[in-house]
Amino acid sequence: MTVIIGYLPSPEGQAALKAGFAEAKARDVRALVVNSPRLGAASEVTTLDASEAAALEEQARKAGVEAEVLQPEHEDNLVETLNRCAKEHDASMIVIGLRKRSAIGKFILGSQAQRILLDSDVPVLTTTP
């Protein structure tokens, strides 16, 4: 079993890492950090390089969790990528970070986050910075 953590280098991504590592440790399973840049997106903004991926794996070790970083590209539907990873790695949950929003913003959840919450094949844990 694994816990999948959807990660982009941002405060929301760091919140997802913290919550995901805590869940993986509590369940005594490994963590799979999925950094999935959109095909054609500005990769320097969202894609981790090898040293950043190694730093995340070290952060997991310090949290008492075994982790691996995967970087599958996706076209338009991130949830399909996460569901495929969840199936391939026997995931028990997906963890994502959400931006804090105003009252109106809460009504209109981010489109990727909403898709993940509605279409995920496994339970989703959300967290904020």
For the regions a protein language model found, what residue spans apply to each?
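Conserved acidic residues
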Residues: M1, S92, D121
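Short secondary-structure boundary segments
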Residues: N35-S36, M93, G97-R99, T128-P129
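Structural beta-alpha unit
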Residues: K62-I94
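Small/aliphatic-rich secondary-structure junction motif
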Residues: M1-E52, Q59-E68
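Short, acidic/small-residue loops that bind anionic groups at enzyme active sites
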Residues: R115-P129
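Charged helix-capping and loop-helix junction motifs
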Residues: L48-A53, R84, I108-A113
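Glycine-rich, Arg-bearing micro-motifs that act as flexible, cationic patches
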Residues: I96-D119
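Short, structured coil segments at secondary-structure junctions
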Residues: R27, A63, Q112, D119-D121
